[in-house]
Amino acid sequence: MDCISTKNNKINKIKFSITIIAFILLYYLIPLNYRDLWQPDETRYAEISREMLQNKNWSIPYLLDIRYFEKPIFGYWINSISQFFFGHNNFSVRFGSFLFTLFSANLIYLFSKKIWKNKILSLNSVIIFLSILLVYIIGTYSVLDSIISFWINLSMISFWLASTSKVKKYKIKNYIILGISIGIGFITKGFISLLIPFISIFIWLFLTKININKTIIHCFFSLLISILIIFPWIYKISYLEKDFIRYFIFIEHIQRFIGENAQHKSPFWYYFPIFIIGCLPWSGFLFSTLNLAWNTRKNKKIEFYLLLWIIVQFCFFSISKGKLPTYILPCFFPLSILIAKNIEKCNLKNKKKLLKINSIINTIVGSTLLIFIILHEKYKFFGCSLYNKNEYYKLILCIFSIFVWIFLNLCIIFNDFKFWRITSLSIIGIAFLFGLYVPEKIIYAKQPQLFIKEVFDDLESSDFIFSNNIGLSTAISWEIKKNNIFIFENKGELEYGLSYLDSKHRFIKKEDFKNWLSKNKEKKISLVMLLPDKHYNWKKFNVPETKKFFQHERLILLKYNF
């Protein structure tokens, strides 16, 4: 009888876990289309892939019809294929990120199940991974980090399976997969796909002393396979664009990671708060999980391997000069497996202390955020409120979404932690509603699609369009499906591409703009600008005056010869 009861209990846990995963997938998928694209990242990747699809140039990335060598090609292929199948919409722009997040979740399930032969533990790992805040944000946001993270994850898994396999056939298969994942990772985001796995692997080999010489030889076999994958594209783009290799290696890698003038320069400790906050709603397990993996490192090699995977990547990006929150995404793959294992141990020992701490932390975080937003709207701590007077419905939605976070965690506490998996639904309110309560002052600066739709007819009928912001330029180009936008005053990330002789004419300084206008009196010209603030007088840009203009918050359209 006890055996039947235990079996039924296990089946119920599996069903409940699958139901939770289904809910999580819903709050990944549904918001993809109705949230406006963010500039500069999402509008950039949307436009590069649109132009690639339009021009059928599958080798050289172009942005606004200007060379753009910041990233390799694979991510753009994925986004172009997505746009081909799903059309010209926000869903297709973000689908690649969602898809590769799902691939990583599937890897977690298969890997956990192979290691521990425990279906419930494997499903718990997936639940934790998909509901981690930073994983969710990046998985519903169009950047290349979800894609490169998948290839890094696959590299690390395939090495473990290859190095621990006793069967020669499976060993060879996994070393081949290691080579493939490094190769495709390279044409997704460059040398990072090679550096992260190999640094992690060599440190692991050095510390464990497991067949070092033999394993290094096998890794060189994987490296050869990766070169075979990388070579065709590298050869073609190097043949067509002679300066690509120099720019890609020295500017996009050496300068980005160790150069004094690196992009997104931040201090060493930058990732510590991001790692803790990004781990929500599971941050309460973070330190105990890492500590447990460290304490069992001598007799539990897989847990030490997963811990080392986290530490090496975290330290690598912390040491690098250039930093963005998205870079540490691969750390959350092994972390979610370790957290699931930690929770299983708590349940087996009937210790609910960690579950309690985690739910209390979530309740405190939610309550603090809720109180801060309410008080900020009342007392305007930073000189102005988050929402305008006509946006109180957005404030209500914002408060409600945070209240859902608090309510679910209180339910877990008062139900004696039987339904701890509901923790994964903490962000469900924010996930579904966030796109509906973004303040206007942010929309009309960072999400320009709405403004572009308001002036769409003017832009579409323009003979020439100028913009002083690259993110805004790419948003205009994406919306009106024209890629010949002129860059006004600020070259931004297109500085390198604009240095080419065939693209120099696409940049106009503000002191030359008046003269350019006088030479094109018969043409309809639009100048779209992002202002420093909504009260900034656009005339300070020293552009010719016009009575035909439209402004909303920080975005303004100036019309000439209309």
Curated annotation (Swiss-Prot):
GO terms for molecular function: 4-amino-4-deoxy-L-arabinose transferase activity; mannosyltransferase activity. InterPro entries: ArnT_tfrase, Glyco_trans_39/83, LipidA_mod_glycosyltrf_83. It catalyses: 4-amino-4-deoxy-alpha-L-arabinopyranosyl di-trans,octa-cis-undecaprenyl phosphate + lipid IVA = lipid IIA + di-trans,octa-cis-undecaprenyl phosphate. Its EC number is 2.4.2.43. It is found in: Cell inner membrane. Its main location: membrane. Pfam families: PMT (PF02366). Keywords: Cell inner membrane, Cell membrane, Glycosyltransferase, Lipid A biosynthesis, Lipid biosynthesis, Lipid metabolism, Lipopolysaccharide biosynthesis, Membrane, Transferase, Transmembrane, Transmembrane helix. One of its GO terms (cellular component) is plasma membrane. The keyword NAD does not apply. HAMAP family: ArnT_transfer (MF_01165). Catalyzes the transfer of the L-Ara4N moiety of the glycolipid undecaprenyl phosphate-alpha-L-Ara4N to lipid A. The modified arabinose is attached to lipid A and is required for resistance to polymyxin and cationic antimicrobial peptides. Belongs to the glycosyltransferase 83 family. NCBIfam families: PRK13279.1 (NF009784). This is Undecaprenyl phosphate-alpha-4-amino-4-deoxy-L-arabinose arabinosyl transferase. It comes from Wigglesworthia glossinidia brevipalpis. The gene is arnT.
